[in-house]
UniProtKB/Swiss-Prot annotation:
One of its GO terms (molecular function) is ATP binding. This is Glycine--tRNA ligase. It catalyses: tRNA(Gly) + glycine + ATP = glycyl-tRNA(Gly) + AMP + diphosphate. Belongs to the class-II aminoacyl-tRNA synthetase family. Keywords: Aminoacyl-tRNA synthetase, ATP-binding, Cytoplasm, Ligase, Nucleotide-binding, Protein biosynthesis. Its EC number is 6.1.1.14. It comes from Lachnospira eligens (strain ATCC 27750 / DSM 3376 / VPI C15-48 / C15-B4) (Eubacterium eligens). PANTHER family: DNA POLYMERASE SUBUNIT GAMMA-2, MITOCHONDRIAL (PTHR10745:SF8), GLYCYL-TRNA SYNTHETASE/DNA POLYMERASE SUBUNIT GAMMA-2 (PTHR10745). Homodimer.
């Protein structure tokens, strides 16, 4: 079975995981809406992250910060001055491209070893390489580009009724800065001592020039970020801790060893503020792609906000009787990307006896969008089956389905990743029991209706 993005995207659209955005108006490039199953899957992924990184962690608390922030925030963070992509236009067809992507795509197509990432190259190095290798426009095939220019990735808008400079605001390009500006507030009100972390889930926006690969890279996306504050000198220890914690979280939810890798950034790839960065990447059908960036940001962010705002961002350690600006370890995860990774990892086509093929999503039960399918064997049994549904739906997202033969209903539930199906049959009226079918093994067992809640309690933990 070849696992392709075409198959996964087709299933996602057909079954209600993801729809093209604004579809009745012809769509809007690279926008996607999560459907009835997609929203459940993504919400379950976010709940699983919050559970392990905030709720169960003795170190961390959460916040939910505003998308619009004082523009000085982006001066301090460096986004207004340095958050940009190197762009060049084709003079023949007037298409615009990222210079670094042109080089990387050409290298992939020609099996050329670049000796590392293009991220650290200067504009001059990129332009010279494109000219030397005679890299052509992907749209028209000509080699006639403008010089490279830097294009800021932030979405700019205006607050209030007049569109002038003093009312300019930006849609946040990351959730992290809301955490940094609230560092002192959270530390004071939560009474947390360093080391501690602040987690946040929220939307961010980047005016990417080359988005693509379904929901992997979009201009509007959701992040699950933790900023972990620690004493300088302990940062590498905590970097190692959170790196492994992130890997363990992915494994616990079903990502396999051979589907992911941890890639350390080379010195030329590192952001100017980073002492070290590791990307946890997933092997999508289109190739390796970053899920999680784990960075040692040192004291850069709090120092910058202290300088620009004039507010003291230091922390006083009352046990050691010393004052310092904490270092920050940041594990930053894309909610849309990791949701797509779980979808790709779960997708399978199984050959059954007789040559039949079963399409199934092997989601971990904790993130499956529908936990239990309730299937009466006949519509005459709906009343009893509906009582089972009414009870279990208090605790789990269930789906009631009484249309079609039972075999086809099982296949439908397999295709959307439902871990368990309950069949309410004619014997159920007499013995007070139902048949529970396991999605992965397809094995069935008889369980008393009164015991169902207890039976399922352990099934959905991770």
């Amino acid at each position: 079975m070849e696992k392709t993005m075409e198959k996964i995207v087709s299933l996602a659209k057909a079954r209600g995981f993801v729809y093209p955005g604004s579809e009745i108006y012809g769509g809007l490039a690279n926008t996607w809406d999560y459907g009835n199953l997609g929203v459940e899957l993504k919400n379950n992924v976010k709940k699983a992250w919050w559970q392990k990184f905030v709720q169960e962690s003795p170190y961390n608390v959460g916040v939910d910060c505003a998308i619009l922030m004082n523009p000085q925030t982006w001066v301090a963070s460096g986004h207004l001055g340095g958050f940009s992509d190197p762009l060049m236009d084709c003079k023949e067809c007037h298409e615009r491209f990222r210079a670094d992507k042109l080089i990387e795509d050409w290298a992939d197509e020609n099996s050329y070893d670049l000796g590392g990432s293009v991220d650290g190259w200067t504009q001059e190095q990129m332009k010279n390489f494109i000219d030397e290798k005679n890299i052509c426009c992907p749209s028209c095939g000509k080699h006639n580009f403008t010089d490279i220019r830097q294009f800021n990735l932030m979405f700019k808008t205006f607050q209030g009724v007049t569109e002038d400079a003093k009312n300019t605001v930006y849609l946040r390009p990351e959730t992290a800065q809301g955490i940094f500006v609230n560092f002192k507030n959270v530390q004071r009100t939560s009474r947390k001592k360093v080391p501690f972390g602040i987690g946040q889930i929220g939307k961010s926006f980047r005016n990417e020039i080359t988005p693509g690969n379904f929901t992997f890279r979009t201009r509007e996306f959701e992040q699950m970020e933790l900023e972990f504050f620690c004493k300088p000198g302990t940062d590498l220890e905590w970097f190692t801790y959170w790196r492994q914690y992130c890997i363990d979280w992915l494994k616990a939810l079903g990502i396999k060893e051979d589907e992911m890798r941890a890639r350390d950034h080379s010195p030329e790839e590192l952001c100017f503020y980073s002492k070290g960065t590791t990307d946890i990447e997933f092997l999508f059908p289109f190739g390796w792609g970053e899920l999680w960036g784990i960075a040692d940001r040192t004291d850069y962010d709090l120092t910058q906000h202290q300088t620009v705002s004039g507010e003291d961002m230091s922390y006083f350690d009352d046990e050691a009787k010393e004052k310092y600006i904490p270092y920050v370890i940041e594990p930053s995860l894309g909610a849309d990307r990791v949701t797509l990774a779980f979808l790709c990892s779960a997708y399978d086509e199984e050959e059954l006896e007789g040559g039949d093929v079963r399409t199934v999503l092997h989601f971990h039960p904790a993130i499956a969008p529908v936990k239990i399918g309730i299937l009466p064997l006949s519509k005459k049994l709906n009343e009893g089956a509906e009582k089972v549904y009414a009870e279990l739906s208090k605790y789990y997202n269930c789906e009631f389905d009484d249309r079609g033969n039972i075999g086809k209903r099982y296949r439908r539930q397999d295709e959307i990743g439902t871990p368990f199906c309950i069949t309410y049959d004619f014997d159920s009226e007499e013995d007070g029991a139902v048949t529970v079918r396991d999605r992965d093994t397809m094995q069935q067992e008889r369980i008393k209706i009164a015991d169902l809640k207890a039976y399922f309690e352990d099934k959905f933990r991770f």
